[in-house]
UniProtKB/Swiss-Prot annotation:
Name of this protein: Endoglucanase Z
Effect seen on changing residue 176 to A: Loss of activity
Top-level taxon of the source organism: Bacteria
Disulfide-linked positions: 368-425
GO molecular function, one term: carbohydrate binding
Subcellular localization: Secreted
Gene (UniProt): celZ
Catalytic activity: Endohydrolysis of (1->4)-beta-D-glucosidic linkages in cellulose, lichenin and cereal beta-D-glucans
Keyword Secreted: yes
Spans annotated as Disordered: 336-367
Organism ancestry: Bacteria, Pseudomonadati, Pseudomonadota, Gammaproteobacteria, Enterobacterales
InterPro entries: CBM5/12, CBM_5_12_2, CBM_sf_5/12, Glyco_hydro_5, Glyco_hydro_5_CS, Glycoside_hydrolase_SF
Length: 426
């Protein structure tokens, strides 16, 4: 968020390790029933990697949508949402794939004043995101991060040691730089922090802020960072930013860098005003068309247009209703969109790595009479669109066999671990 807000491409650069999916099963090893699978199966998120100007999840360019929390600063009001319950609700009710922990740094009540308290808030969110098969953005929420480079390095080293083996975690090392030089100020800071992270975590996605409140992505694209799995921040507010900023984004994409919208709003850039429906829809189309992942600002109940909730309530604002609909209908979902948990320590399930389609040892005869036949999908991305995929628990027939989706999938039935073969239709 701008400071004024405070005053009120190529060869796929995939993970070194093979892509794995984790299924957490509360039933017996592979003798599982469909009911068990749909209610207790867990798919860990796919690792993210940068390929040219796209971010890949596994081996396919995808984008995900979710929510940004408000500043974590003590006493600012948004910290009450830094809970496992909040994250689980986003997963279950919103079908969110991303949650962003916006850890305030220099301002009152932020990390520099209370490092332990703010770090604990971030870790609660990250731990809950991992438990709920979501991506978690660890955000250094600063407008002048170059002034605290050593603190940023120490913080992200600690985060990398704790979470570097989790594909869920994304490092956002600079929120919104002011009107400062990319090449002389932001880039040197970013290179130092990236180097420190990469010494511990060689491959998780790192996002770097860009000049002028993360709008001048075109400037960064002309002098990109020479490191792998780096994306660049684009922020917009639909009431303020329109086609001219999208043109900057197009130029950056044409120059070969990947973008990630870690913060966006339906209203004005100062957080006030009503929802700009036309520009919000234009931005959503732009992000979907270009596979740009995004997190909406802000899951909060402050008395302003950008907030998800009205003050001291769980009633959705105009913006909250709009954003929830956008996230729920986003074409790609992380992990299992159908389940959520608030306390992973109470989970008594068995952790089983599955690298291929899940099948029973001897598929039984299945009732296929009422099932769609591939490629006649069951679910739509948009209410008025054509069916494009299956959601968790939805079945489809392919080559005489009945398959059920374990999570959101548009792959060929039986071709990967997003499917379970229920039985033969013969």
């Amino acid at each position: 968020m701008p400071l004024s807000y405070l005053d009120k491409n190529p060869v796929i650069d995939s993970k070194k390790h093979a892509l794995r999916k984790k299924l957490f099963l509360s039933c017996a090893y592979f003798g599982l029933s469909l009911a068990c699978l749909s209610s207790n199966a867990w798919a860990s998120v796919e690792p993210l990697s940068v390929n040219g100007n796209k971010i890949y999840a596994g081996e396919k360019a995808k984008s995900f949508a979710g929510n940004s929390l408000f500043w974590s600063n003590n006493g600012w009001g948004g910290e009450k949402f830094y809970t496992a319950d909040t994250v689980a609700s986003l997963k279950k009710d919103w079908k969110s794939s991303i949650v962003r922990a916006a850890m305030g740094v220099q301002e009152s009540g932020g990390y520099l004043q209370d490092p332990a308290g703010n770090k604990a808030k971030v870790e609660r969110v990250v731990d809950a995101a991992i438990a709920n098969d979501m991506y978690a953005i660890i955000g250094w929420h600063s407008h002048s991060a170059e002034n605290n480079r050593s603190e940023a390095i120490r913080f992200f080293q600690e985060m990398a040691r704790k979470y570097g083996n989790k594909p869920n975690v994304i490092y956002e090392i600079y929120n919104e730089p002011l009107q400062v030089s990319w090449s002389n100020t932001i880039k040197p800071y970013a290179e130092a922090v990236i180097s420190a992270i990469r010494a511990i975590d060689p491959d998780n996605l790192i996002i770097v802020g860009t000049p002028s409140w993360s709008q001048n992505v075109d400037e960064a694209s002309r002098d990109p960072i020479n490191a792998k799995n780096i994306a660049y921040t684009l922020h917009f507010y639909a009431g303020t930013h329109g086609e001219s900023l999208r043109n900057k984004a197009r130029q950056a994409l044409n120059n070969g860098i990947a973008l990630f919208v870690t913060e966006w709003g339906t209203v004005n850039a100062d957080g006030n005003g009503g929802v700009n429906q036309t520009e919000t829809d234009a931005w959503v189309t732009f992000m979907r068309d270009n596979n740009i992942s995004n997190a909406n600002w802000a899951l909060n109940d402050k008395n302003e247009g950008a907030s998800t909730y009205y003050p001291d309530s769980k009633n959705l604002t105009e913006s909250g209703k709009k954003v929830k609909s956008i996230i729920q209908s986003w074409p790609y979902k992380a992990g299992s969109a159908a389940s959520a948990t608030t306390d992973p320590s109470t989970d008594t399930t068995t952790d089983t790595t599955v690298d291929e389609p899940t099948t029973t040892d001897t598929p039984a005869t299945a009732d296929c009479a009422n099932a769609n036949v591939y490629p006649n999908w069951v679910s739509k991305d948009w209410a008025g669109g054509q069916p494009t995929h299956n959601e968790a628990g939805q079945s489809i027939v392919y080559k005489g066999n009945l398959y059920t989706a374990n999570w959101y999938t548009a792959s060929v039935p039986g071709s990967d671990s997003s499917w379970t073969q229920v039985g033969s239709c013969n």
